[in-house]
């Protein structure tokens, strides 16, 4: 699961996969801005065939948050 999420994040943000850990913050560590995060959420929704409501997306700040959300909701 983490590897699949990491690959999508790397593609969306144009960074190397080895820069991404479960603890990585999208904004602080990976340099994402709010538009990057919206696009990333959309890519993850498509890849994992789920919908992440805005209220939940706002709580997702790290890679681990995304992985946990997908595990609990797919």
From Swiss-Prot:
Domain of life the protein comes from: Bacteria
PTM description: 4'-phosphopantetheine is transferred from CoA to a specific serine of apo-ACP by AcpS. This modification is essential for activity because fatty acids are bound in thioester linkage to the sulfhydryl of the prosthetic group.
InterPro entries the UniProt entry points to: ACP (IPR003231), ACP-like_sf (IPR036736), PKS_PP-bd (IPR020806), PP-bd_ACP (IPR009081), Ppantetheine_attach_site (IPR006162)
PROSITE patterns with a match to the protein in the record: CARRIER, PHOSPHOPANTETHEINE
Location in or out of the cell: Cytoplasm
UniProt GO BP: lipid A biosynthetic process
GO cellular component annotations of the record: cytosol; membrane
Pathway, per record: Lipid metabolism; fatty acid biosynthesis
Keywords: Cytoplasm, Fatty acid biosynthesis, Fatty acid metabolism, Lipid biosynthesis, Lipid metabolism, Phosphopantetheine, Phosphoprotein
Single GO MF annotation: phosphopantetheine binding
Record PTM O-(pantetheine 4'-phosphoryl)serine, positions in chain: 34
Primary localisation category: cytoplasm
Domain Carrier: 1-74
Annotated family: Belongs to the acyl carrier protein (ACP) family.
NCBIfam families tied to this protein: acyl_carrier, PRK00982.1-2, PRK00982.1-3, PRK00982.1-4, PRK00982.1-5
Function: Carrier of the growing fatty acid chain in fatty acid biosynthesis.
Protein's name in the database: Acyl carrier protein
Name of the gene this protein is made from: acpP
């Amino acid at each position: 699961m983490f590897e699949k999420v990491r690959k999508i994040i790397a593609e969306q943000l144009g960074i190397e996969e080895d820069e991404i850990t479960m603890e990585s913050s999208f904004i602080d560590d990976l340099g994402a801005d709010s538009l990057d995060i919206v696009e990333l959420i959309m890519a993850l929704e498509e890849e994992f065939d789920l919908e992440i409501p805005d209220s939940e997306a706002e709580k997702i700040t790290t890679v681990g948050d995304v992985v946990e959300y997908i595990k609990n909701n797919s």
